[in-house]
């Protein structure tokens, strides 16, 4: 394993440790909107780890990790020979093929990172802004991974007991894929 890989993994793990402490403190104090923001931050690390793990070009993987270590944005060379920024959306679309729930966590979490009507969740159900298909898909994922009752309406109050479970699912999957990076393996 290279020095760059070591440093990248250290950065990801440091962020994850802080996220874990933060989400538990926030949850214990009933600060649910910020819990969802922290969940979204953990997902941000996860999509990057997945993206790297799917690259078969180890040199490209190292280059992207080096960009992170140096505090720079990720980019890729286009067919025209120009550098193009790799966006969160690019990585979410890529990762969503492997983990279908990622897009839902990302999209919903963004509503709590950026100022939006989701911050009025005490008065308005932010899940109501989603399509019936999206709500049904979220309930299906919550049921599949965490035994969320199909008959439960999707509200913040009903989701709250599952929030830490969703966080742990994202975090543990990320750490598993981080081990693959450490060993220079491609993700399955």
Locations of regions flagged by a protein language model:
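A cross-kingdom marker of C-terminal helix-rich interaction/assembly modules
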Residues: 1-33, 37-39, 49-52, 58-188
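Cytochrome P450 catalytic-core helices
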Residues: 42, 46
């Amino acid at each position: 394993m290279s020095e760059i890989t070591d440093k990248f993994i250290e950065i990801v793990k440091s962020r994850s440790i802080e996220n874990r402490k933060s989400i538990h403190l926030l949850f214990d104090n009933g600060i649910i909107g910020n819990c969802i923001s922290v969940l979204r931050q953990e997902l941000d690390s996860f999509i990057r780890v997945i993206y790297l793990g799917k690259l078969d070009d180890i040199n490209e993987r190292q280059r992207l990790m080096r960009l992170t270590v140096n505090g720079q944005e990720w980019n890729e060379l286009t067919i025209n020979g120009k550098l193009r920024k790799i966006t969160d959306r690019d990585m979410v679309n890529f990762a969503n093929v492997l983990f279908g729930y990622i897009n839902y966590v990302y999209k919903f979490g963004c509503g709590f990172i950026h100022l939006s009507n989701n911050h009025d969740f005490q008065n308005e159900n932010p899940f109501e802004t989603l399509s019936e298909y999206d709500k049904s898909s979220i309930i299906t994922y919550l049921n599949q991974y965490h035994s969320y009752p199909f008959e439960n309406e999707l509200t913040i109050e009903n989701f709250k007991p599952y929030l830490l479970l969703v966080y742990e699912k994202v975090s543990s999957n990320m750490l598993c894929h981080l081990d693959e990076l450490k060993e220079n393996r491609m993700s399955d």
